[in-house]
Each structure stands twice: as structure tokens, then as C-alpha cells.
Amino acid sequence: MEKPGGDDGDWHLFNRRPLIDLAEPVLPARFRFRTAADVGPEAATQAHLDAWYPSSFPETGMAGVQATWPYRDDLHVLVEAPDGTLAATAIIWFDPVSRTAEFEPVGTHRAYRRQGLGTALMWDGMKRARDAGAETMLVACLGSAAHQAARGLYHGVGFRPLSRDIPYVQRHA
């Protein structure tokens, strides 16, 4: 931090919620839920790239993610638009030992934002995580006031702050 008590925005807020009292996900007409198991790894990769366009994440990087334990294509959730575009994406990482799952990352294609897709995707994803055996769900976001969109989404579906990190980086003049 630049000074004691300062907030330069470079910190993460970690959020948690129990997988109880889950709302039914609601999508706009003709949108539908899919998984990477349904659409294949190439389409799931494109959804990721579209959600964070422009992205420095290489197209080939998703193959490494998909090959990493505990990646499961049935827990890589997506929303498909009526025209076939994969409009929202989230990967759920599930640890069966701790019975905890984490959303990372969560994103919506820029042409489909502010339509409730992220909210619906998270409700659907939490139900899938619970059905897989999870009892607790986690998600992280940038924590400062300048980054309210993700925090608003996550808190809107019942996540509450668990902890935060503090970057210890010396600033050079």
C-alpha cells in the first residue's frame, strides 16, 4: 500500500456462502445453460476469450487449464444465447475432500452484459456444485470501491466477505 490505510485498489476480497437456500436461475427467453462437456473445449475456450476481450490469456492457455486437476468439464458452466454465442462462462473448481467449490473465473461476453446472465449462471453453477457434493462455495474479486461490479454480483447471490489479502509492494518514486 502506498501509505498506511491507503487503498490503491490492488487487493482481493475473498467471499464465501453455504450451498443452501439457492434460488432458481432465470435466463432471458431462448437462452440456455450449457457445460464445456456439452460444447467441447474449443467453444469453451472461445467463451473465455470473448468474456475478457481483449485478453492477454493465450488461446492455447485454456488447454492447460482444462488439463489441470480438479478441472471438470461438467462444472465449466456456460450460458448460450439464442444465436449460439456462448455469452457467459464460469469454471467451478471442486475439492471433494473439503466439500468446497470455487468460481474462478466468472465472465460475460461484452455484448451480453447487464442482462442477468452472470446472476443466472452463478445460481446454476452453485446448484451443480452442490449436486457434485460441495457444501460451501467461494469466489474472489478485486476489493476496492473502484471494482464494484463483480462484488455486487457475488454479494447479490449471497456471498459474504471471508477475508482479504494485503499486497506488500514497495512503491518506487
Segments from the language model and where they lie:
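Conserved acetyl-CoA-binding loop-helix of GNAT-fold acetyltransferases
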Residues: P105-T108, R114-D131, R151-G156
